[in-house]
Amino acid sequence: YFNEDKLDKYLNLKLCFLEQANDKPFNLGSLNNAGFLINEDYLDYLVVNNIDFLPMIADYRYSESPSLLIKHGYNNLPIVPSKNSRLIVKSPRRENVFLGSVLLPKNVFKKVNGYSNSYWGWGFEDTDMRRRLEVNKININYRDGFYQPLIHDNLGYEINDEKKVVPTKYHIDNQKTFNENWNNDENYLKDGINSFKFEILSNQEIYKNMRNDALFEIRHIKVNF
């Protein structure tokens, strides 16, 4: 997708595909922290783009404030498309979320201690990040990006025997973790990039182009934590 014509190869940017290479449940917050720490020395801001949101029209320009980049793309998504189910999760109000594709200045990311490492399986690392911004009284900007959601089975919701949409165990467990984490507004200071340990298993160059002082690079990085 990105090797075709979707990006200007003369921009000064680094595009990293982070892969969690272990048998543990998925932990998006830790993956995001790994991406930041690997590239911290030379970045001035980062964009966290979930792999299941494909940018069609997106504004990735620098902002001094954290920014939610998606406006169109939080469609009513099917719960279990692999079973041809028509039951859906309703689109969230974007004033209540900070997910999908978000921009975070380096100084803001460090101030809020990055993402929590406590959420395994599905969800709430984004809700936790929004709370970190809110308790630090950091305003969130909103841009008008258009993204194509890539449809897949939802790990946060399932369909019970009565054909109703209910939260999965991952959802329930992470909701409990979120409530425990935020029984004190200072707990986030102990859970984030300052407490995260990981190892880089591989760091593969996919594409590289140098022109004048601009380096455009695509890398696939596997990490374990």
How should each PLM-predicted stretch be described?
Residues 75-104, 111:
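A recurrent flexible, glycine/aromatic-enriched loop bordering the glycosyltransferase active site
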Residues 55-87:
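Conserved donor-nucleotide/metal-binding helix-loop-beta segment in metal-dependent transferases, i.e.
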Residues 104, 114-119:
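Conserved nucleotide-sugar donor-binding catalytic segment
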Residues 4-43:
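Active-site-proximal specificity loops/subdomain of glycosyltransferases
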Residues 32-33, 37, 57-68, 110, ...:
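Short alpha-helix within the catalytic core of nucleotide-sugar-dependent glycosyltransferases
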Residues 118-121, 125-225:
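C-terminal catalytic/acceptor-binding lobe
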Residues 42-56:
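Short beta-strand-to-loop acidic/aromatic patch adjacent to the donor-nucleotide binding site
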